[in-house]
Structure formats: structure tokens, C-alpha cells
């Protein structure tokens, strides 16, 4: 704990306390005893700099700090002497005619000598300026202040006037004047008041008992003074038998001192407490007048005592009264709204628990303390529990401290739902004490307890780490103390140290595998969990990719896990995500530069898995990256693989995506050539019908083709296929998230392992269109084939391509869609559009056809 600021503050008040004592604060120690001695420096002023007022001189060392421990002892001793002096003065005046004898006389002289020493000592005691709250140590200012305030009264209360009279006259005189001058001794009672005020602020003592002691001392002193004064009236009255005490004790002056004093105090107490037994009462007018004023004074004193005691008692029961009022209000609320008994019990149980927990003042206290102290408290209270939780085993102390400082302790009553099934909680809970039931319900059957969490159990981590709703209801079985940690705080702590984040995630995955009493589907989902048994679930990206949980997958990749790790079958996370249609997971993996060309044990790439499972959007995204990394062989590799396997369905899907049917693979073979070599006649026919070049393939496969389908048959098939056969493209436009990933990855250049290469400058999807020569209304009568091209970025580039492909003057042509609408902007053309290039001849032909049909 940092105590430098406290030490400097206390040392400013205690250092330099030589002469009268410089211990205590000057030692630089800090404890509860020194806490009440702190002097706060002004705002913006260093504690050791200007916390003192005045200029230090050569005599500054003899100035005593009022906060010095030795001076405090002296001051306490003076309080004892003041109490003695205040008690003995009324007694001597009333019962000894102000002329003490024997031991009392000697004691009075000794006490007066001590008070004289205190007067001299006060000239060397620094003081705290009431305006600036600074310690003034300048002796000149100290002397000036004392002489102008308390000096005269202190001297007057110390002078032995009767002794001076004896020295001057040589006679011992008993005069009322000496008794009146003796009243000045009561001036010293201010020290007692200051003493009790200081004790009330000292946290080492109980405020209630200090306050009670103060009230009792005030009451007893007033009883003593009133009794002495009442006896003095009776003793000085000329007709002593007509006094309050003379009526009871006729010759009271001859009675012992103890009987007389006891009788006086007895009368004073019975009168003050308004009991008034009547055995001792006023017998003359003077006593009656005194009683009148005494009883009026008692009214005020009684009100003062009752008010103080009431405040002390009520303050102690205030919380209980507020609690009872809140319970009454809650009961009325339940009754008005006809809530069921179960809810009523939960409400009342929560309020009772809250009342009991408030006595600890945990959070309220923590909010008042500085961060360093809070950290120490949390470390002492929570760290021993948190470090043993399975989720945080092996995590560094630094990250653990970061988390425990953000944990909030809570008390939850029994039978309270902390997390409801299918809810996505925002917090992670750690069980410190009590038991929590894990309950499953399918909505129709009764609830079933599948597990019980005890001390150091944790729940809510599934939602925090995998962003999945909680598959179970977590309900307290007994009174539970829980530590609540916000998900945001957990993720912030994990991001602060990536290696600890890996440890937490591995602990989480390992624990989920070992939980035989829980369903694996809670983590993987029903489909993914079916692929693994409970004892053989890989704790890596493959498991998370199978869940489709892109957020958790991204967390794993950010902490450094390899995106290209494979299972026993060679499948990577991209293979699994692509085959299951998890587009978000695919995008996350692509952002982390995974290799799209990795093949599994069966020779399948993620691109093949996507098209085989008919996930066209994912195929479109992956094909973009495959074509970037292998621009000349991406299409050929896929078509040849489908042809080699004789997979007609997949081949049709590939052709629907507009892949060039004569594309070559890495070995220079086309799909038709592979189909002929493998003897897949149906595949060969499909390829020919979709525009494959027979002559190009036949030159390499004359012998193989004879076994399956003849080249002549294929050439004959070419004649029967539809001329200008258009390709029907089913590629959807990329989603905004996919387009963002394409732009991000495409603009980042080379990545790790050299797998990612630059894409198009605009980073967008490659739209392709079919262009035909002729008017769309008469296109079916044309015998000229169309062309499938990549759409350029501008209309000027588009017209240049038209001139090259269709051999027409593009400046004198119109571009129309299949509905006959003219297109004059490249921005309105979409992927898979069919465009028609219309010349003047085509327009004339259409006009002539309209005139003939009209006639």
C-alpha cells in the first residue's frame, strides 16, 4: 500500500518537534493512531512544501507540534487535572467555606503549578490556522495569537487569589469574593470539551460509547454543582432549621461531611430526574427561587440528553425501520397485482438478503476507495478462489488481477434463476459458496437437473466465449455468493495478453469435452456433435468451425492459432465451414490468410466442398480467391476433377457458374479430355453440349474415346446443340460482409507464407455477361453464337471488347437487355445479364418485320 502521501502529511505536522517532542509523526510511520493527526495540504501544493505556514527560523526547533504524541499525552494529563479542579472547586466552596485543609490544599497548589507550566508551554505549541488549515510554526505568531485569545483567562483561572491575600496581609481570610474568583477555574473545562471532541473523531474508539460517556460526564458534573450550590444556600441561610436539609437533619452542620454531600447529591438527582419524592423540598423563599431556575434549566438539559440519546438509538435502528417499510411496500405490491406465491417468496427473499448484505457495505465501500487499495482487497478476497477455477488455470497472475478487480460479489437467495435457458447472458459467474443447479427443459417435459455446481464452479462462460445462448437454466439451490464478471471485461483481459487468452480457450474446450454429464451439442450444435464421439473431439479450430461460431473462431485466430491445421482426414477449418455453409466462418478464415488450395485426403479443396454442397455464395467467394492465387488453372482444376470423378451434378453446378468449359488444369488437360480418358460418356456429352471443343480433346484421346463414345458422335452432337448456347449463371452478388473481406484481403497484398496475392484493383467480384449480336426480339432466328466475357469497368472498354469479339463498329451500335431497353451506363449492368448488340441493319430488320405484321 502506498503511504507516502499520508506520511508526508503527518510528518509536516510532527517533524521539527524538538524541545517539546518530535516523535510520532516524525517517524514517518502510518497507523490508526496517526490517522487523526493528518493535515491535508491545499490543493495543488506538495505535502512537504507549503503544508506549514510561517518562516522557519533558528528557534523553530523548539516549537512543539500539537499533533505530537508526547504533547497529546501531556494534554490528556491536563484534562484529568481539569476534571479534578472542576469537581473540587464547588465542593470546597460549599462544604469548606472555600478554605481547603490538609491534602486538598496541597493538591490544589500542585494542580495550579501544572496549569502554570501549561501556560508557559502553550507559547511553544504550534497551532492549526482555522482559515487556511495550515500548521503555524512561527513563534511570534504563536505568542501573538495566545496573548490575544486565551492567555488572560488561563492566567486568571490559575492565580491562587486567597494565597496572594495571605502573602500580602499575613491573614487567612474567608470572603465571598474569593469564591467568585474561583469560578474562573471552570474556564479550564474547555480542555475537556476538546478532549471528547477529539475522541469522537478517533476511529480507534466506539463513537456510541464515547458520546454516552460525554453525556454522563455532563450530567454528573451538573448534578454535583447543583447539589453543592443548594447546600451552600442552606448553610448560609440565617434560620438553618428552615432549610431543605435542616428540616430533615436539624443539626446538619454537625453531621459528617459524607452525609451532607450525599444528601445534596440525592436531592439534585431526584429534582433533575423530576422524580421528587418530597422528603427533601424547599423550605424558604431563596430555595424556592433556586428550585424554579434549576428545574427550568433541567428542562433544557433533559431535552439535550434525550435528543442525543434518541439520535444514537434511532441511527442504530434506522436501517431496520427502512427494511420493514420496504417489506410492507413489497407485500402491498404483491397483493395489489395478485402475483403468485412463488414470485412473492422470491421478492421477499431478495429483499431480506439485500438487507443482510448491506451491513457489509461491500460495493459502497469499494467505490470510495482508490484503485490501488481496491486491487489489494480483491487480490486478498477473490484471487484464491479465481485462480482455482478450471477456466483460469495456468493464467498469469497479471491477467488474474486484472479480472478480479472488475468482479462484483453478489448474494443470491435460494431458488433464484441466475441465467434462464436460451438466454444470452452478459456475465460470467463464479461460485464462491453455495450450490447452483444446472437444469434442462425441452419446453414440454418437466425440468431435469443435469448437474450441480459447487464452490469454484463457473457458468455463463459458454455464452461469453462462443456467443451461443445458454442451453440450460442456472438456478441457485442454496444461498450463494457469486462473483460476477462482465463479458466485456473478460475479453478485455484476454486481449491484454494473447498467450493467456490461448490458455483460457484451451481450458474451456478441454472442459467441454470432459463434461460427460452435459451435452456436446451445447458446444458444437446437433449436426456438428454427431461427427465426433465424446472422447475424440479435437480441441482446435476444427471444433469451433463445425459450430459455425464465427466470433469464437475469430478469437482463436487472433491469439495465434494456425488457420490451416487439419484433422486426421486432412480437412482444415475452411473445408468444414465451406461444406456446412457457414459463410461468416469462411470470411473470418479468409481474413486470416488461410490457404484456399489445401486438399484433404480425398483430394477435395474447400472450393470443391462448397460447390458439392450447393453453397453457391461461399463457392463464389472462394472461387474469387482461388482465381487470384491461380488465375489460369482454378476453373480447369475444378472441371477436370468433376470430369475425372464422373460427377455430373457437380459439373452442372460448375457450368452454371460460368466456368470456361475448355479451361485447362495444371497438367494442361481440359475437362472433355479427362472425361474421354476416364470413359465417362455422359460427362463428355454434357461438356460438348455446353460448348467444349471436340477437336481439341480428340487429338489427345483417339484411342480412349473409342471405348466410351466416338469422336464422330461428339461432332454430330455439336451440330444438334443449340447454336449460340448461352450459359445460365446462378452466381449471386456477394453480401456486404463478403465484399468487405474481398476488398480488405485484396488490398493487403502478400500475406504470410506467400499464399495471398493481389486481386483486382477495385477488389470487387468479377461480373460476367453474355453478349449476342442481333436484336433481342429476333435473336432466336440468328445462327451466330454469343460470347461470355468479363464485364470491364467503363463503357468505353466495353465497346472495345464488343468490336474485338463480334467484329462490329461499336460506335454505331446500341446495347440492349433482353427486354429491348437501351443501356448507356456500365453501372446498371449486373452479373449474369444477357446483352444484345444491335446495329442499324438489325433495327431496319425489326422495323420491316413490324410493318409486315401490321399489314
From Swiss-Prot:
CC terms in the record's Gene Ontology section: endoplasmic reticulum membrane; monoatomic ion channel complex
Q: What is this protein called?
A: Potassium channel AKT2
Q: What segments bear the compositional bias annotation Gly residues?
A: 13-24
- What is stated about domains? The segment S4 is probably the voltage-sensor and is characterized by a series of positively charged amino acids. The pore-forming region H5 is enclosed by the transmembrane segments S5 and S6 in the Shaker-type (1P/6TM) and contains the GYGD signature motif which seems to be involved in potassium selectivity. The KHA domain (rich in hydrophobic and acidic residues) present in the C-terminal part is likely to be important for tetramerization.
Q: What is its main location?
A: membrane
Q: How does it assemble?
A: The potassium channel is probably a homo- or heterotetrameric complex of pore-forming subunits.
Q: Read off the InterPro entries from this record.
A: Ankyrin_rpt (IPR002110), Ankyrin_rpt-contain_sf (IPR036770), cNMP-bd_dom (IPR000595), cNMP-bd_dom_sf (IPR018490), Ion_trans_dom (IPR005821), K_chnl_volt-dep_EAG/ELK/ERG (IPR003938), KAT/AKT (IPR045319), KHA_dom (IPR021789)
Residues given in the record as a nucleoside 3',5'-cyclic phosphate binding sites = 391-511
Topological domains, Cytoplasmic: 1-75, 127-149, 201-214, 307-855
Q: Cystine bridges: which residues?
A: none
Q: Name one GO molecular function term.
A: identical protein binding
- Where does the record place the KHA domain? 768-855
Where does the record say this protein resides?
Membrane
Q: How does it sit in the membrane?
A: Multi-pass membrane protein
The ANK repeat units are at 536-565, 569-598, 602-631, 634-663, 667-696
Q: Where is this region: Disordered?
A: 1-24, 744-765
Extracellular-side stretches of the chain, per the record, are 97-105, 171-179, 236-262, 283-285
Q: Which Pfam families match?
A: Ank_2, cNMP_binding, Ion_trans, KHA
Which regions span the lipid bilayer?
Answer: 76-96, 106-126, 150-170, 180-200, 215-235, 286-306
Intramembrane feature spans: 263-282
Q: Which source organism does the UniProt entry give?
A: Oryza sativa subsp. japonica
| Composition bias, Low complexity | 1-12
Amino acid at each position: 500500500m502506498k503511504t507516502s502521501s499520508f506520511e508526508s502529511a503527518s510528518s509536516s505536522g510532527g517533524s521539527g518537534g524538538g524541545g517539546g517532542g518530535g516523535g510520532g509523526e516524525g517517524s514517518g510511520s502510518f497507523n490508526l493512531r496517526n490517522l487523526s493527526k493528518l493535515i491535508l495540504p491545499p490543493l495543488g501544493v506538495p505535502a512537504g512544501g507549503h503544508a506549514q505556514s510561517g518562516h522557519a527560523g533558528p528557534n523553530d526547533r523548539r516549537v512543539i507540534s500539537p499533533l505530537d504524541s508526547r504533547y497529546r499525552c501531556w494534554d490528556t494529563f491536563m484534562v484529568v487535572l481539569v476534571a479534578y479542579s472542576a469537581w473540587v472547586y464547588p465542593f470546597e466552596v460549599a462544604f469548606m467555606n472555600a478554605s481547603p485543609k490538609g491534602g486538598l490544599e496541597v493538591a490544589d497548589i500542585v494542580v495550579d503549578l501544572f496549569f502554570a507550566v501549561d501556560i508557559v508551554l502553550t507559547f511553544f505549541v504550534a497551532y492549526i490556522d482555522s482559515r487556511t488549515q495550515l500548521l503555524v510554526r512561527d513563534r511570534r505568531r504563536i505568542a501573538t495569537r495566545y496573548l490575544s485569545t486565551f492567555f488572560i483567562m488561563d492566567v486568571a483561572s490559575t492565580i491562587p487569589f486567597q494565597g496572594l491575600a495571605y502573602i500580602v496581609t499575613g491573614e487567612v481570610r474567608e470572603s465571598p469574593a474569593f469564591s467568585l474568583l474561583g469560578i474562573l477555574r471552570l474556564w479550564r473545562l474547555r480542555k475537556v470539551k476538546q478532549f471528547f471532541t477529539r475522541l469522537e473523531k478517533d476511529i480507534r474508539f466506539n463513537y456510541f460509547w464515547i458520546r454516552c460517556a460525554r453525556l454522563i460526564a455532563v450530567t454528573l458534573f451538573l448534578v454535583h454543582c447543583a447539589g453543592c450550590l443548594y447546600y451552600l444556600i442552606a448553610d448560609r441561610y440565617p434560620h438553618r432549621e428552615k432549610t431543605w436539609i435542616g428540616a430533615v437533619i436539624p443539626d446538619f452542620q454537625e453531621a459528617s461531611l459524607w452525609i451532607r454531600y450525599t444528601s445534596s447529591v440525592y436531592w439534585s438527582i431526584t429534582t433533575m430526574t423530576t422524580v421528587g419524592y418530597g422528603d427533601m423540598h424547599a423550605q424558604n423563599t431563596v430555595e424556592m427561587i433556586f428550585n424554579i431556575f434549576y428545574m427550568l434549566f433541567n428542562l433544557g438539559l433533559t431535552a439535550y440528553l434525550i435528543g442525543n440519546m434518541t439520535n444514537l438509538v434511532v441511527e442504530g435502528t434506522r436501517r431496520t425501520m427502512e427494511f420493514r417499510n420496504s417489506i410492507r411496500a413489497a407485500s402491498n405490491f404483491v397483493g395489489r397485482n395478485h402475483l403468485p406465491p412463488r414470485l412473492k417468496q422470491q421478492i421477499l427473499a431478495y429483499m431480506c438478503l439485500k438487507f443482510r448484505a448491506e451491513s457489509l457495505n461491500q460495493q459502497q465501500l469499494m467505490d470510495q476507495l482508490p484503485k490501488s487499495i481496491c486491487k489489494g482487497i480483491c487480490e486478498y478476497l477473490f484471487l484464491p478462489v479465481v485462480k482455482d477455477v478450471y477456466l483460469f488455470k495456468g493464467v498469469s497472475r497479471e491477467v488474474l488481477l486484472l479480472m478480479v478487480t472488475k468482479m462484483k460479489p453478489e448474494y443470491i437467495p435460494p431458488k433464484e434463476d441466475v441465467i434462464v435457458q436460451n438466454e444470452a447472458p452478459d456475465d460470467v459467474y463464479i461460485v464462491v459458496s453455495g450450490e447452483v443447479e444446472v437444469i434442462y427443459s425441452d419446453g414440454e417435459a418437466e425440468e431435469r437437473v443435469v448437474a450441480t455446481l459447487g464452490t469454484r464452479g463457473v457458468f455463463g462462460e459458454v455464452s461469453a466465449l462462443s456467443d451461443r445462448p445458454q442451453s440450460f437454466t442456472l438456478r441457485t439451490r442454496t444461498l450463494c455468493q457469486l462473483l460476477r464478471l462482465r463479458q466485456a471485461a473478460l475479453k478485455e483481459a484476454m486481449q491484454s495478453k494473447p498467450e493467456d487468452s490461448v490458455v483460457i480457450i484451451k481450458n474451456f474446450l478441454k472442459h467441454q469435452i470432459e463434461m460427460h454429464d452435459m451435452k456436446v451439442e451445447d458446444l458444437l450444435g446437433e449436426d456438428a456433435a454427431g461427427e465426433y464421439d465424446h472422447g475424440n473431439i479435437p480441441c482446435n479450430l476444427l471444433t469451433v468451425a463445425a459450430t459455425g461460431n464465427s466470433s469464437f473462431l475469430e478469437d482463436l485466430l487472433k491469439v495465434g492459432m494456425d488457420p490451416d491445421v487439419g484433422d486426421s482426414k486432412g480437412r482444415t477449418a475452411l473445408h468444414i465451414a465451406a461444406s456446412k455453409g457457414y459463410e461468416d466462418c469462411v470470411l473470418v478464415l479468409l481474413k486470416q490468410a488461410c490457404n484456399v488450395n489445401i486438399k484433404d485426403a480425398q483430394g477435395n479443396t474447400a472450393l470443391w466442398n462448397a460447390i458439392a454442397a450447393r453453397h453457391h455464395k461461399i463457392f463464389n467467394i472462394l472461387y474469387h480467391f482461388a482465381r487470384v492465387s491461380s488465375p489460369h488453372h482454378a476453373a480447369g482444376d475444378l472441371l477436370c476433377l468433376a470430369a475425372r470423378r464422373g460427377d455430373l451434378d457437380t459439373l452442372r453446378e460448375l457450368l452454371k457458374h460460368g466456368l470456361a468449359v475448355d479451361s485447362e488444369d495444371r497438367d494442361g488437360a481440359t475437362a472433355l479430355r479427362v472425361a474421354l480418358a476416364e470413359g465417362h460418356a455422359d460427362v463428355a456429352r454434357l461438356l460438348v453440349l455446353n460448348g467444349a471443343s471436340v477437336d481439341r480433346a480428340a487429338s489427345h484421346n483417339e484411342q480412349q474415346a473409342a471405348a466410351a463414345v466416338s469422336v464422330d458422335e461428339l461432332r454430330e452432337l455439336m451440330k444438334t446443340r443449340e447454336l449460340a448456347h448461352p450459359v445460365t449463371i446462378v452466381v449471386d452478388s456477394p453480401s456486404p460482409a463478403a465484399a468487405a473481406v474481398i476488398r480488405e484481403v485484396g488490398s493487403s497484398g502478400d500475406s504470410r507464407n506467400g499464399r495471398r496475392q493481389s486481386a483486382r484493383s477495385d477488389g470487387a467480384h468479377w461480373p460476367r455477361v453474355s453478349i449476342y449480336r442481333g436484336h433481342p426480339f429476333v435473336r432466336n432466328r440468328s445462327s451466330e453464337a454469343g460470347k461470355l466475357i468479363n464485364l470491364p469497368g467503363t463503357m468505353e472498354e466495353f465497346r472495345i471488347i464488343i468490336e474485338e469479339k463480334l467484329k462490329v463498329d461499336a460506335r454505331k451500335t446500341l446495347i440492349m437487355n433482353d427486354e429491348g431497353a437501351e443501356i448507356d451506363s456500365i453501372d446498371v449492368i449486373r452479373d449474369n445479364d444477357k446483352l444484345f448488340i444491335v446495329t442499324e441493319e438489325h433495327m431496319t430488320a425489326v422495323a420491316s418485320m413490324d410493318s409486315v405484321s401490321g399489314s
